């Protein structure tokens, strides 16, 4: 009987004092992520969004416990933002209106030989720590830098943080914090004959004048290759043979915003309309579910320490193979 009472106490407490519990959770969340608001009205507005997100997370995880989903959600530092705000402030992929493919840039896989069933470039030392782009639409710069860092490690044996701010400020074909595209970044590094290190050109998360300095140059690029559009088999081959690959995805759903663990597959995730650039650093299988290992640029508080496992071979889920590319070094 005592065990039953212990089990019932949280339920009774929640039934009697739901607002007090929410108040406590809200204050704890604000403290955890150092949240401050300009006015009481602003805080009330943000709390309503937070409560709606918290409810969504709770319902999803209940469904996941019943086997409806292959992944779980968790509250994070984006809790007081709508999914629309996240896309507006924290993505930044801008695809050129006309993309010309040529034999010079198209990646033609060598289909001879098997690729490994799984690969994780984090374990091979090809991947730098997770970064946070902040509220600057510079995802394209972090994705590009991640692919360049992987190739630098492959060529020289040295893992080095390269400068996304160098790209934000200096790639004239892109729009800095207003968005951009990865192959434009690779072309810039090729034309510029280099990109600075993060130490030489630190990230500030806003548009500034181009301050590239050759004395801080840490890597070069001699071109790029684009994966055949929508071809996950070719993408797998590229990741296995080349290294980390820049990819674009649809990151517009609440389920993506609060991803925590498991293999992410949401049937509402668009395979046509992509809006966010990330980095594919490997692939594998978890509990029978094939996945890509994706490095995001929203800090370690997001996802699984900054990473997400995204469904692989599920009809190009979230458009992951639509705009994949990597630099040549």
Curated annotation (Swiss-Prot):
The keyword Nucleotidyltransferase does not apply. Glycans are attached at residues 103, 268. Its EC number is 3.4.22.38. Residues 16-114 form a propeptide. It comes from the Eukaryota. One of its GO terms (molecular function) is fibronectin binding. It is an enzyme of class 3 (hydrolase). Predominantly expressed in osteclasts (bones). GO terms for cellular component: apical plasma membrane; external side of plasma membrane; extracellular space; lysosome; nucleoplasm. GO terms for biological process: bone resorption; collagen catabolic process; negative regulation of cartilage development; proteolysis involved in protein catabolic process; thyroid hormone generation. It catalyses: Broad proteolytic activity. With small-molecule substrates and inhibitors, the major determinant of specificity is P2, which is preferably Leu, Met > Phe, and not Arg. InterPro entries: Papain-like_cys_pep_sf, Pept_asp_AS, Pept_cys_AS, Pept_his_AS, Peptidase_C1A, Peptidase_C1A_C, Peptidase_C1A_papain-like, Prot_inhib_I29. It is found in: Lysosome; Secreted; Apical cell membrane. Disulfide bonds join 136-177, 170-210, 269-318. Residues 1-15 form the signal peptide. Gene3D superfamilies: Cysteine proteinases. SUPFAM superfamilies: Cysteine proteinases. Belongs to the peptidase C1 family. This is Cathepsin K.
